Amino acid sequence: MNMGKLKDIPKIDRPRERFLEKGADALSKSDLLAIVLGSGIQGKNVQELARQIIQKFGKGFLNITIDDLRKIAGIGHAKALQIIAAISLVKRFYQEGGSNGQTALLLSRKEENSFQLQNRRYIGNKYKLADWIFSILEKECSGNSFMDIFAGTGVVSARVATRFKGIILNDFLHSNHAVYKAFFDKGEWDREKTYHIIEEYNRINGKDLKDCYFSKNFGGKYFSRSSARIIGFVRDDIEKRKNDLTEKEYYVLITSLLYAVDKIANTVGHYDAYFKKVLVDDTFAMRSPVPIQVENVEIYREDANLLAKRIPADIVYIDPPYNSRQYSRFYHILETLVKWDKPKLYGTALKPAEENMSDYCRTTAKDKLAELVRDLNVKFLVVSYNNTYASKSSSSLNKITHDEIAGILAKKGATKVFEKDYRHFNAGNTNFNNHKEFLFVTKVK
C-alpha cells in the first residue's frame, strides 16, 4: 500500500473525513494535528508532517514554542502559529475553568488516562447509529433481555445496557471477546492494581528492550520498531502475571493493550495492509478501560448459528458481516495479541494461517441467515443492513440483498423497515450516493 501522498489515500481514510464520520475518538493525535495544519509542505503530506511533529515532541507537545516548530524543515511562521494558537486556546479554557471552580469540566488523572468502549477503529462500527437504533427499539420492542449476537465493538449493547435486565454479547473474534470481558464483565478486579501496572508499562522505553516476536515481525511496518518492542514485552509480561490476576484484571490489561495498539497502528484502521511510506506514530500509551454498568451480562465467543439454538432472549440484534471482508483476517494482529500463540506469518500483510472464517462472508450468507432466524427463540428480531451491495469494490459487495433479508424475516413474523442516511467504511471504490442504513424489526408470530 503506497500512500506517501495524501491524495493517494481514499477520502474516507483522511483525517477530516474520518473525524466527520466517526468523531475525534477514532483519530490519533497526529490525525487531529493534521486537521489543524490543513496542508503539508513540499515533499511531505499533512499526515506525514503531523506524525513527524508528534514524534519529535511527544509528551512535551503542549509546551512547545514557535521557535521549536520553526526548527523543523519546511515549517514556516504561519503553520507554527496555527499549532501554537490551538494549544493556547485549549490552555486558556482549561485555566479559566479551573479558576472558576468548575471542577466538573476537568477530568481527573485517572479519567483522563482512560479508554471508553468506542475508542477504537472498527469496520461497521455502529457508535454513531446507536442512538437511532435504541430509539427504534424503545418504540417497537418490549422485553427484559437483549442479545447482541454479532456484537462487534459492543457499542449497541452498551447503549441499551440500562434498558434491559439482561445483556448477552457474542462474537467469534478473540479480540472482541477480550474487550467484552474488560468492559462488561462483572468479575472481581482491583482498579488501583491494574492502573499501577498500566502506569508501569507506560514508563518503558522501547530503545532499552531487545527485539522479540512482535517487533521482528511487525516493527517498522505496522508499528515503529520501538513501539513494537514495547507491545511484545508488555504482552509477554501480562502472561507472566496471569496467575496473580483475576480473570477481569487479565482482560483489562489485554484490552488496554489492544486499544493502545489501535491508536498507533500505521494503518487505515484494520490490518489488511499498512502504509509503506508514512512515518509511524511512536507514542505508545496504555490507559484503563472505563467499565460499562450493566445489571446482568452473559458473554460468549461462539458461532452465532450454534448459539441461537440454545440461548433464548426477548430481543436479538443481528448485525453480521454481509460482504467478503473476513474480520479474523482484517484484525489478525489483535487476534494474535489476545491468543499470544506467536503463529508463523505469511505474505506482505504478515497474516497467520486462516482461522475463524465466517460463512456470512461467502455465497452461503443467505442460507446461514435464514438458518439463524429460523432457530432463534426470541420475541423480536432487529437486523441492521446497509446498501453497499452496489459497491464497485469486490470486497464490499454484499452477499445478501435487501429483498432477501425481507423475505427471510417475513417467514418469522410481521416486519417493519426503518432507514437512515449514513456513510460506511469505504476503501475508495464505492459510490455512496443515496447510501442508507436499514433497520428491520420483526415481531415474531
Model-derived features with residue positions:
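Charged, compositionally biased N-terminal leader segments and the immediate start
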Residues: 1-35, 48
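S-adenosyl-L-methionine
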Residues: 105-147, 155-162, 186
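Conserved proline-anchored active-site loop of SAM-dependent methyltransferases
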Residues: 133, 147-160, 169-173, 309-330, ...
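Class I S-adenosyl-L-methionine-dependent methyltransferase module
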Residues: 166, 172-291, 328-362, 367
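Conserved SAM/SAH-binding loop
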Residues: 301-306
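Conserved Class I SAM-dependent methyltransferase catalytic core
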Residues: 359-413
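Class I S-adenosyl-L-methionine
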Residues: 399-445
